């Protein structure tokens, strides 16, 4: 049997929030599977450059692009620049959360504007790039978009109402966009990460990590690479008949 080409051979992928954590792991994995990767970052240019350098050192192709994906003009420039440098975008991974610091406060003590800002930031971080890239994908008649969400949307925990509501909003947006863009050949799916060992969970203590791990049948918390694998699966041609799908990468904490 002849060797099959890499899953993403000849494709360009844009990964938002790719300087650290799940985004960085996803960028590296997609590149390993043949994609040319646009590594988006907001603040940490050095970390994004290191991700791109790692990819190039392994024989792949990657370029970092700075942009705040909650800003429409910045997103427009990001997509224009990435397309000019790398070619039309075939895969869009919407990993940037837009929520820099979750409030981690009970709802009754959480200011209303904090909740509303979290929801708006997350919605903009998903819908602005999806609009900018989705238009070109629809015109081309093909494309794959994966939204990275959180298990908190369906299994909310005390103190995280801002994250739970924001993630539920983007999951609803993903389903709605899957309906609208499907006739144009564009697939949109959701990966919901369980507790993952990233900068976003640095606030947690050892007892928190043990408690989270104890809830999973697999007995451990996720690594960024665990979630990246689920993203790559849904983004790839292997999932060519999947759209509007919800894939939890949580070790079995939630079994929908």
Predicted regions and their residues:
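Conserved glycine-rich cofactor-binding loop
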Residues: 12, 19-20
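Catalytic Tyr-X3-Lys loop
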Residues: 108-127, 142, 146, 170, ...
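A glycine/serine/threonine-rich, flexible loop-to-helix segment
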Residues: 162, 183, 190-216, 226
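Alpha-helical segment proximal to the catalytic Tyr-Lys
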Residues: 135, 179-183, 240
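Short, small/polar-rich loop/turn modules that mediate ligand/substrate recognition or access, typified
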Residues: 182, 187, 242-244, 250
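Active-site helix of classical SDR
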Residues: 130, 166, 174
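Conserved glycine-rich Rossmann-like NAD(P)H-binding loop of the short-chain dehydrogenase/reductase
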Residues: 33-50
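Conserved mid-core segment of classical short-chain dehydrogenase/reductases
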Residues: 76, 98-116, 159-162, 202-204
């Amino acid at each position: 049997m002849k060797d099959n080409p890499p899953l993403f051979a000849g494709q360009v992928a844009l990964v938002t929030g790719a300087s650290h954590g799940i985004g960085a792991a996803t960028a590296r994995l997609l590149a390993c599977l043949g994609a040319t990767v646009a590594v988006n970052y907001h603040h940490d240019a050095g970390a994004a450059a290191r991700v791109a350098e790692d990819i190039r050192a392994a024989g792949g192709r990657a370029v970092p692009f700075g942009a705040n994906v909650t800003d429409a003009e910045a997103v427009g420039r990001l997509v224009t620049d990435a397309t000019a440098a790398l070619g039309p975008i075939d895969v869009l991974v919407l990993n940037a959360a837009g929520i820099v610091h979750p409030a981690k406060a009970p709802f009754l003590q959480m200011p209303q504007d904090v909740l509303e800002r979290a929801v708006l930031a997350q919605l903009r971080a998903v819908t602005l790039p999806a609009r900018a890239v989705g238009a070109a994908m629809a015109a081309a008649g093909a494309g794959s978009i994966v939204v990275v969400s959180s298990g908190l949307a369906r299994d909310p925990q005390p103190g995280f109402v801002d994250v739970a509501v924001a993630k539920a909003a983007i999951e609803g947006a993903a389903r709605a966009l899957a309906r609208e863009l499907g006739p144009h050949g564009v697939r949109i799916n959701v990966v919901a990460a369980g507790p993952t060992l990233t900068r976003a969970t640095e606030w947690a203590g050892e007892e928190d990590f043990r408690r989270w791990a104890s809830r999973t049948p697999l007995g451990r918390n996720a690594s960024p690479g665990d979630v990246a694998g689920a993203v790559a699966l849904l983004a790839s041609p292997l999932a060519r008949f999947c759209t509007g799908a919800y894939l939890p990468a949580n070790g079995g904490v939630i079994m929908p």
